[in-house]
């Protein structure tokens, strides 16, 4: 959000004319702030609460996440469904073509990874301390439901795309419920990007540290234009298509 403000106020580049705003997981809050839904102060406050709530939902070291590379969502869903009596795992992120993240308790993830190995599906444990975006985050959902209800949400100045549904959000009345649901829900990033492309978007601008989302978007559709803004030099190079 800070970089967004710098681009807009100091460099006079009007990113507010973007057709859509979207963010991945925690980044969805930055998208809301950039679209004028939340104030910067409220965004910082609720993210601090969110972080503590999610970390406290599962004892440290008891849960985790596994990234799966080179497989498709249908295959992973099938593996989880076929083994539901042996372990319980959840698709947490549908990031792009060939990149899926699964959450669960450590013991269940180990069993799941054995199945992946048997099918020669590449996977790697992520260095995280909790199983985000699954029903194991229920305690965090309860906390966030109460805290989000206290916030004032303005009507979005731009169309937002929800992590939970992968679809457009047209008014603030839906936003609070979707943000609460986001805690336990799959991040439908691939679906979100495809929606925007199908609505005519041909250029994406990633604002924030790193270029992870840029890479994901390119894997979803190599024909779209993708730019990442991480610092002042990137801002000077930005070229927004009319």
Descriptions of predicted regions:
Residues 1-78, 126, 203-233:
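FabD-like malonyl-/acyl-CoA
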Residues 1-18, 149-242:
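Acyltransferase/transacylase module recognition
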Residues 16, 34-184:
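Alpha/beta catalytic cores of group-transfer enzymes, especially the acyltransferase/condensing modules
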